Amino acid sequence: MLMLELFGAARCPHTQEMRDWLEFRRRDYVEYDVELDGAAFSRMCELTGGQRMVPVLVEDGKVIQSGWQGHGCVVDGKSHA
């Protein structure tokens, strides 16, 4: 199985829901808080074509899910100057 990357934000309940789902499915993943990690925020924006909504789930360098069940939290990237 390929490694998953979860781009999210601690304050976002939808990130928590995706995290819970991944753990329930026993999937290994690396998580990045894009509000604390400027490099992760930039990478997420590159992968999504500039989208600033979390959570974003990436597998093998490709976005496989954006948002959680049609919902997400907007992040602005200003918290990690």
Predicted regions and their residues:
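Local sequence-structure signature of Cys/Sec-based thiol-disulfide redox active-site neighborhoods
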Residues: 1-28
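Structural micro-motif
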Residues: 48-58
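Non-catalytic, surface beta->alpha helical segment in thiol-disulfide oxidoreductase systems
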Residues: 59-81
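Glycine-/small-residue-rich active-site loops that bind phosphorylated ligands and cofactors
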Residues: 13, 36, 64
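Thioredoxin-like thiol-disulfide oxidoreductase module
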Residues: 34-50, 77-79
